[in-house]
């Protein structure tokens, strides 16, 4: 097999692998990591995510509080529980208001081309109600622009 055929085969295999990736992102603090977080990761995988990226706050979390557990240990817990990549949310966003926290995390997620899904948990579990609330918030944001 000549070089161009080897290159074509490698390119073809790479494209096939990339098109089969269905990566999901989770915005997290894992402060501390608990069974509910593990369940969320398991459910994200069960819903078809082939890869999971967690955007996680570092040693300081929302409200400028120090994290209960070191960021490296929290990242390791996430990796052992099924997350494939942990990306640290920079301090200015990690310690900001909920809106800025989320906005910073989403900006990071949008910079990762393979991520197609945002996986999140909720206390209500009512997807329709959450979707309607998101629509209202989106409409208000558009009107303000």
What are these regions (language model features)?
Residues 1-145:
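Nucleotidyltransferase catalytic core that binds NTPs
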């Amino acid at each position: 097999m000549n070089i161009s055929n080897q290159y074509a085969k490698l390119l073809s295999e790479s494209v096939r692998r990339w098109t089969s990736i269905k990566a999901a992102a989770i915005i997290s603090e894992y402060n501390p990591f608990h069974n509910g977080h593990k369940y969320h990761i398991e459910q994200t995988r069960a819903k078809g995510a082939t890869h999971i990226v967690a955007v996680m706050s570092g040693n300081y979390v929302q409200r400028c509080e120090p994290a209960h557990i070191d960021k490296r240990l929290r990242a390791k817990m996430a990796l052992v529980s099924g997350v494939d990549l942990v990306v640290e949310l920079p301090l200015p966003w990690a310690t900001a208001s909920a809106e800025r926290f989320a906005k910073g995390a989403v900006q990071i997620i949008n910079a990762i081309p393979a991520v197609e899904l945002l996986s999140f948990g909720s206390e209500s579990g009512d997807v329709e109600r959450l979707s309607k609330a998101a629509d209202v918030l989106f409409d208000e944001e558009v009107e303000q622009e």
